[in-house]
């Protein structure tokens, strides 16, 4: 997605733009995206072109380290898809405790770790206390 594309998307009636800035669906690996893979300057230029007419979402952010997530937010992204980040902690509870834990207790344990991880990412992304 280029800054020049923005008006075409907005004129089509979108509410949220999910630009491609080098992000991809799928796994980046434990280190997150490679150095130089994400084009923050392009994201900033897209944000400037949008000029608050629509919001910016990013797909393919699951393996972003905290500092990458924060830089994307500073560059204009307001919605980051983090499903895998939250499911991983819940799935770890399943792997570790499912063979020996009653289902109701297992669900409670999952909910607790997912809530804590959600709160941690809300702090990282600067969204805690905003709703």
Task: Identify the residue ranges that each predicted region occupies.
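Alpha/beta enzyme core
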Residues: 1-52, 66-82, 88-92, 123, ...
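Conserved short-loop catalytic and cofactor-binding motifs
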Residues: 30-34, 60, 105-109
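A short, structure-level motif marking secondary-structure boundaries and short turns
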Residues: 53-54, 103
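Glycine-rich beta-to-alpha transition loops that act as phosphate-gripper elements at the mouths
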Residues: 55-66
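Extended, intrinsically disordered, low-complexity segments
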Residues: 95-131
